[in-house]
Amino acid sequence: VGAGERSANRSGSEGAKKGKLPYLRKDASDRKGQPKSATTIMLQTNRRGRGRMTSFEQAKEVLKRCFGHDGFRPEQEMAIKAIMGKRDVLAVMSTGAGKSLIYQVPAVALGGTSIVVSPLVSLMSDQVGKLLDLGLHPAFLNNTLSLRAQETVRNRIKNGEFQILYVAPERLSNPAFLSAIENLAIPLVAVD
């Protein structure tokens, strides 16, 4: 999962210094569970003076409000703290361990349109259906859609109407798709 922009001030593992994706390990965090090399970002939450919250606190709020969960699993928390701190993450977890939330929660919390690359058309449809049921704004763009439907989705992409967009890997080389995302704010790209 890429958090969009790389931190200019990287400290931590040798892999990070060499430009490789760091692996999240339990020993890579401090006593509070914060990844050692993550940067905490402060975001304004609203205009009513609620103050400022860290981006991870914002992710916890999204988890509760949008997904109905009270807390993250330990592996999810470590990965999401890193993502919200603008760090790249490679999360290798078993089926059913909650990998999707690792990119879905930050996608909603960060705003803009996050792109999820998935080779599985059935997964795209399933995930979009679940997110729609939660009141979120996802979409998928693949060859199962008619040409007219693909054009409609591309136009809505250009307007920034989606929070999460699922695409197949080959879509990343499609000129019409690249044109549609050209001016988007893309805070996160995930490969699922």
Question: Residues of each region from the PLM?
Answer:
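Conserved pre-motif I regulatory segment
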Residues: 53-94
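SF2 helicase catalytic motif II
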Residues: 163, 177-192
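Pre-Walker A (Motif I) flank of P-loop NTPase domains
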Residues: 85-91, 112-113, 161-163
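Walker A/P-loop
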Residues: 86-105, 117
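Short, Lys/Arg-enriched N-terminal segments with co-localized hydrophobic residues
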Residues: 36-52
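Short, low-complexity, charge-dense intrinsically disordered segments
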Residues: 3, 7, 11-18, 24-34
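Conserved nucleic-acid-binding Ia/Ib motif block in the N-terminal RecA-like helicase ATPase lobe
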Residues: 60, 115, 121-167
